[in-house]
From Swiss-Prot:
Gene Ontology CC entries for this record: small ribosomal subunit
Single GO biological process annotation from the record: ribosomal small subunit biogenesis
Gene3D superfamilies reported in the protein's UniProt record: Ribosomal Protein S4 Delta 41, Chain A, domain 1 (1.10.1050.10), RNA-binding S4 domain (3.10.290.10)
The UniProt record lists the keyword Magnesium: no
Protein known as: Small ribosomal subunit protein uS4
Species of the source: Nostoc sp. (strain PCC 7120 / SAG 25.82 / UTEX 2576)
GO terms for MF: rRNA binding; structural constituent of ribosome
Cited SUPFAM superfamilies: Alpha-L RNA-binding motif
Keyword Zinc-finger in record: no
Main function: One of the primary rRNA binding proteins, it binds directly to 16S rRNA where it nucleates assembly of the body of the 30S subunit.
Family annotation (Pfam families): Ribosomal_S4, S4
UniProt-annotated stretches for the region Disordered: 22-43
Keywords for the protein's UniProt record, in alphabetical order: Ribonucleoprotein, Ribosomal protein, RNA-binding, rRNA-binding
Oligomer status and interactors: Part of the 30S ribosomal subunit. Contacts protein S5. The interaction surface between S4 and S5 is involved in control of translational fidelity.
Length: 202
């Protein structure tokens, strides 16, 4: 399954706010479609599926990519759900988004893919790159790159910088100080239900 490229507000109305996908909020509180307001009681499977979809769409992943992350999380000591969120949050595209360099994760991915971002002084154009504590994330020292990010900083996707990051707006340089803590994950999701969803596949 490929990444979702359809109407974003339609997804937000169905799943709730997805801060990584879009800054817009749904004006209608019920799901889209003719029968959106007449929702039947959902099965446990449907609830787990919805949480999985939230995670996949917010971080802009394909089904295969998310499954790989679940498998990686299972191999790490600790809560699989929490490790899964940390792996997703520490991706380079998400880190660029959380630093305020881009208004959404898709926009951050584009910055990375087009070579506008450096890690420890070297251009990294792989959005899935895992950022580590101590690494410096910066805007490439080129006029087009700086202009893009300076424009984005005027309209950040999220207001608060998470505690594991720091950012110098004048130099356009950020630093990863630690791995993100659960309370700073912006997406409202039950990660345990996501792990349960994949329990037979991972």
């Amino acid at each position: 399954m490929s990444r979702y490229r359809g109407p974003r507000l339609r997804i937000v109305r169905r799943l709730g706010d997805l801060p990584g996908l879009t800054r817009k909020s749904a004006r209608r509180a019920y799901p889209p479609g003719q029968h959106g307001q007449n929702r039947k009681k959902r099965s446990e499977y449907a609830i787990r599926l919805e949480e999985k979809q939230k995670l996949r769409l917010n971080y802009g992943l394909t089904e295969k990519q998310l499954l790989r992350y679940v498998r990686r999380a299972r191999r790490v000591t600790g809560s699989t759900g929490q490790v899964l969120l940390q792996l997703l949050e520490m991706r380079l595209d998400n880190t660029v988004f959380r630093l305020g360099m881009a208004p959404t994760i898709p926009a951050a991915r584009q910055l990375v893919n087009h070579g506008h971002v450096t890690v420890n002084g070297r251009v990294v154009n792989i959005a899935s790159y895992q950022c580590r504590p101590g690494e410096e994330i910066a805007v490439r020292d080129k006029a087009p790159s700086r202009k893009l990010v300076e424009n984005n900083l005027q309209y950040p996707g999220l207001a608060n910088l998470p505690s594991h990051l720091e950012f110098d707006k004048n130099k356009l340089v950020g630093k990863v100080n630690s791995v993100i803590e659960r309370e700073w994950v912006a997406l409202q999701v039950n990660e345990l239900l996501v792990v349960e969803y994949y329990s037979r596949q991972a």
